[in-house]
Amino acid sequence: MVAFSALSGVSALSLLLCLVQHAHGVSLKVSTQGGNSSSPILYGFMFEDINHSGDGGIYGQLLQNPGLQGTTPNLTAWAAVGDATIAIDGDSPLTSAIPSTIKLDVADDATGAVGLTNEGYWGIPVDGSEFQSSFWIKGDYSGDITVRLVGNYTGTEYGSATITHTSTADNFTQASVKFPTTKAPDGNVLYELTVDGSVAAGSSLNFGYLTLFGETYKSRENGLKPQLANVLADMKGSFLRFPGGNNLEGNSAENRWKWNETIGDLWDRPGREGTWTYYNTDGLGLHEYFYWCEDLGLVPVLGVWDGFALESGGNTPITGDALTPYIDDVLNELEYILGDTSTTYGAWRAANGQEEPWNLTMVEIGNEDMLGGGCESYAERFTAFYDAIHAAYPDLILIASTSEADCLPESMPEGSWVDYHDYSTPDGLVGQFNYFDNLDRSVPYFIGEYSRWEIDWPNMKGSVSEAVFMIGFERNSDVVKMAAYAPLLQLVNSTQWTPDLIGYTQSPDDIFLSTSYYVQEMFSRNRGDTIKEVTSDSDFGPLYWVASSAGDSYYVKLANYGSETQDLTVSIPGTSTGKLTVLADNDPDAYNSDTQTLVTPSESTVQASNGTFTFSLPAWAVAVLAAN
């Protein structure tokens, strides 16, 4: 859990106010009457496998390159142990999806332990939970097989198990082990699988699709890492958009994310070359995304491929009759998700372990089709997919992948939404504060991706600018229905995009919560169902605000995008006490990272006098007053 430091009485931040310059006081009066309804699912998550956020990130399988997947398989992350060598064997496939396995050639005079190691994704996090490993083996062998987790540089053993297993040269057989572990101090841990060299001497053994899991979130099979899932749960988001993003599109039609190759047993998933420079195992597949939504209480927002791949692949959008097989593929996917067991694809889902249909209400057609040559044909492509999906599933909310009018049909179909993305500078985000004030209320908005960009780690200036942007769309959350910061996760050792919301390494305790994370958490955890009118004697800037209510509770969100302290009076008739949460630093460049945590929120209890709260907001600050 993310713990805020609790302060009673006067906030520690207020003790510094005499040292900094104050602006004139700002008075805010929150109406307790009327207001506009606010979307109940406003804050949530956008996920795609970028920065090893899936494989090597939130997905719980810990071995890198577990099945030698890909058109050009390699031995990345694997090495031999003892008097033996390893090689790729394309003549002993495990399945049609896993055509290559690891061949272990044992020396004629071998003794002791021989086998193979895997270094994980820049390490393996051993957290002290029970671990389990599975693998396939082929070759004439009858004897002990040992799995160990051992320090890469220290040789310290953090857990092990030995089983007796018999295999033959005719077929692959699967073996699995479970074992307790002790917590490792860092991620410098190797997975080691060995056999008895004296028994295997002079022979060859093949190993296929090896896996390693620690404890998973809510003990879900093939599930999520609890360390990262817990941090997301703390945010209390409402939805999950998946599987992308650029990673949905692929670099070509053939390389797109294919739903039916991400289901079933892991060794029946071929994986794919992701669009962010590394291969995706697709162990985190369609089922796993829906279980993620179930376990964190999130509304699923499914992205489907719409005939357009990334421009970097030199692709021309697919249009006309050539779209038909791709539309059919989406309809098959939706039947798999929503169909009962009397349908072909619903029965397939049940055979894969999910008897009941999932609860899917939202589908986004494509990703960022305003970019890279997709705009001109998107109206045609969106309409083709919309018409087919709406005819089969009229209750689904269908979302266009852009809000740019030039890329959309002249008249959007009734009930459809649009998706608005904004990566910008801090001043650029602040400049968008009132963008949503005058929108056509007949077309709901999904802000599918936004953040400050062009910096390594979120800093206070950027995070405050994001808060200003968020206040702007929350004020208009009758029409802005959902919004998600992006990207969400970042393995510090292998990063393709910065900044990101949450960083981590493979050390069990290494999770780095950015200043932007705390802004997202503060805003998401303090939500009303009605946006209230606020009157003031001051204009917006550098102080920005929005107020909402839920029953007798009121939430006032504030952002100070400036270098002067702001003195405030906030009047909410009928309230008497409140909790003030403040994230602030006088240095606009202050940031949290893998080497420092400089900025965290503080909490204080504040009392009202006749319904009026009086306090000061430091420079470069984001605050939430929760009053009742």
UniProtKB/Swiss-Prot annotation:
Primary gene name: abfA
Functional summary from the UniProt entry: Alpha-L-arabinofuranosidase involved in the degradation of arabinoxylan, a major component of plant hemicellulose. Acts only on small linear 1,5-alpha-linked L-arabinofuranosyl oligosaccharides.
Localisation: Secreted
EC assignment: 3.2.1.55
Main location class: secreted
GO annotations of cellular component type: extracellular region
Catalytic activity line of the entry: Hydrolysis of terminal non-reducing alpha-L-arabinofuranoside residues in alpha-L-arabinosides
pH dependence: Optimum pH is 4.0. Stable between pH 3.0 and 7.0.
Record's protein name: Alpha-L-arabinofuranosidase A
Pathway of action: Glycan metabolism; L-arabinan degradation
Pfam families, A to Z: Alpha-L-AF_C, ASD1_dom
Upper lineage: Eukaryota, Fungi, Dikarya, Ascomycota, Pezizomycotina
InterPro entries assigned to the protein according to its UniProt record, in alphabetical order: Alpha-L-AF_C, ASD1_cat, Glyco_hydro_b, Glycoside_hydrolase_SF, Glycosyl_Hydrolase_51
Biological processes, Gene Ontology terms: arabinan catabolic process; arabinose metabolic process; L-arabinose metabolic process
Gene3D superfamilies: Glycosidases, Golgi alpha-mannosidase II
Signal peptide: 1-25
